[in-house]
């Protein structure tokens, strides 16, 4: 098959069974490896669907400047889509995100605008959003997809990722867990999996230093892409029954083990998700199946503690 653009290759990522990270009495863990997606993360799906939706609704045209506040992967995804579709893109990011994220956005031809993270990621994200909305108010050509409240975000997880998981696993799924960034992944996939098995156990996952769903304090953490210190508008808070809190050290150690024990190169938030999945697998026990998502690839974390000896 010949694709007319790289965007036609988005999705259909593999499901992989973890063979070396669970005990004999634990449930099996299956991971949806989005690091192999076009653009290296699950967010390419979201970026493409938000732009497709905006085009269909006549919200953008050849003069549009796409501006989005993000802690990383969504910006990379939008920069990629903009490169293919011919849109000018500006990405507003906390200055605490990895250097690789910034470079990837620029590599796709987009502009990076940094906002200082003064130790509270929630306030920083709010400042990023406020700046994007000011830019929109000052320029009629600016379009802000607003991933935290755009229904096209969870919808693509329902229509693509969730359905892919059901088809690939092709047996009952007893547990699912996902870190909370925009809330699109856990909402979209969670709703699909719960429709297939109403008895499924679903956990939301948060960094210890940004556990807003659990009523914790908001600081800065290394689990980039989740734990933005806000409760997203699109998050279905009825879809999960519990919240699992993961320390930075757990996330980093688990991501490193995924590489050294399973040969899977993935980012820090993938370590977060798998650390939670291991806890859920122990709770559900042998004979059950737990699914989680590996949101991105490791190569955008060389400058972070993930690659420290």
What kind of feature is each model-predicted range?
Residues 1-309:
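PLP-dependent amino-acid enzyme catalytic core
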